[in-house]
Amino acid sequence: MILVLLLILIAFLYIYFPSSLNQKNQELSTLSKNLINNYSFVPKTFKQKIHIIIPLKSNVDNIIHNILKQTEKVDIMTIIVPKEYENKLKNGKNSLCKLLRDTCIIQISGGYGMLSKERETGTILVYVNNLFSDPNTLKNMLNRISKSTKKIFYFSDATVIDNSIPIGIDDAYKL
């Protein structure tokens, strides 16, 4: 009798949990699609090119969603990933992999590649540390740096590097 109840419980959990995970994945996918579609209407008011760099971490989907909710549009978002995750992200089928592919350029950590070229074009590089939970976070950062002659700025949500400071990806997170 106990064995039968245990089997029924296992069957119930097996049926219920995959469907609830699939439902959460579906809701996340819908939210991501809506944010991406609405992002085209966000104004671009800052003259310089803005490049957001995000390290791969557990809450990266929340960070990207919050960046898509900002009141200032960015030109490029790059996700920095360890080499062993590159294929998983590029070929993955879940909503996080799809969100990253739809919004970010995937860059292997340790490589400079495109980011080293950005330094020479007067681009503002924003190395994300935290969530960007306030929709005006990016706009406030950009307004503050535009009124200063400094080249490196430290905020609670990001380290911002203006123009052509010769610094690499990994070095920016050590500052």
Curated annotation (Swiss-Prot):
Annotated keywords: Signal
Report the leader peptide range: 1-23
* Superkingdom of origin organism: Viruses
**The name this protein goes by in its record:** Uncharacterized protein 111R
Task: Name the species this protein comes from.
Answer: Invertebrate iridescent virus 6
